[in-house]
């Protein structure tokens, strides 16, 4: 498949996303955006679960497969199942010559360059940006977003590089905070709304890089059990998004 302006095609009203690990968190983030900006029905799946259960397929569905390498075994297996059921498929990948890109109907490359470290930081940012832009394009095409709002959101995207640079200037502050929790045996990342996927990704990054137990959880569910597992020395990163009551 070749890179394709996906929003220029007549697609259905059901969008399904699949990925593993970081890619799954990208899909979860995109679900919030698509439901808000496009008024489309969106479902997400962990690819390793999707491939091992019986699935119902609707002809108007588009399946989006997110993978940094484009070679994730479970994600490719899920793609193969969808292809065998004649579903429309789209790949969001970093490597456009990959198997997942090759066997998808559409390709949306993230162009992040090689991911050197264990933590897939560049790819995560690239994935959510591509999915956000797709949501904006589809929302505009479906007249769910006014032209002025669309332009403002694009302007905000262009400001991101500068904001990232400012964040990196706080390296010393982050070092000081991390030393406070150096002896912690576990961490809990809490998030609500858009920040819930970020909490999941933050917990995954801590596990991957520090080999410290960490858990991401919806902030509203903290009181239903998880709060009993943590004592005062355990760090809790709380993030919230303003969402309708």
Question: What residue spans do the PLM features occupy?
Answer:
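Short, solvent-exposed amphipathic alpha-helical segments in soluble enzyme
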Residues: 30-36, 59-60, 79-83, 106-107, ...
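Active-site phosphate/pyrophosphate-binding segments
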Residues: 9, 13-16, 106-229
């Amino acid at each position: 498949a070749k890179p394709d302006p996906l929003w220029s095609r007549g697609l259905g009203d059901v969008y399904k996303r699949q990925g593993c690990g970081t890619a799954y968190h990208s899909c979860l983030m995109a679900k919030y955006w698509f439901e808000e900006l496009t008024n489309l029905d969106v479902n997400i799946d962990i690819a390793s679960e999707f491939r091992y259960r019986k699935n119902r397929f609707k002809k108007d569905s588009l399946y989006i497969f997110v993978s940094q390498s484009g070679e994730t075994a479970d994600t490719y297996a899920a793609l193969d199942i969808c292809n065998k059921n004649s579903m429309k498929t789209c790949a969001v990948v970093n490597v456009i010559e990959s198997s997942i890109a090759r066997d998808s109907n559409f390709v949306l490359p993230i162009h992040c360059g090689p991911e050197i470290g264990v933590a897939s930081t560049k790819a995560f940012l690239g994935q959510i940006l591509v999915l956000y832009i797709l949501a904006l394009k589809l929302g505009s095409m479906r007249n769910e977003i006014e032209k002025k709002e669309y332009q403002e959101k694009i302007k905000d995207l262009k400001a991101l590089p500068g904001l990232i640079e400012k964040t990196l200037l706080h390296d010393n502050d982050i070092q000081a905070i991390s030393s406070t929790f150096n002896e912690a045996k576990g961490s809990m990342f809490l998030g609500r709304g858009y920040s819930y996927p970020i909490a999941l990704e933050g917990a995954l990054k801590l596990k991957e890089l520090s080999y410290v137990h960490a858990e991401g959880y919806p902030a509203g569910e903290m009181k239903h059990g998880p709060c009993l597992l943590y004592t005062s020395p355990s760090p809790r990163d709380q993030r919230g998004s303003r969402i309708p009551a």
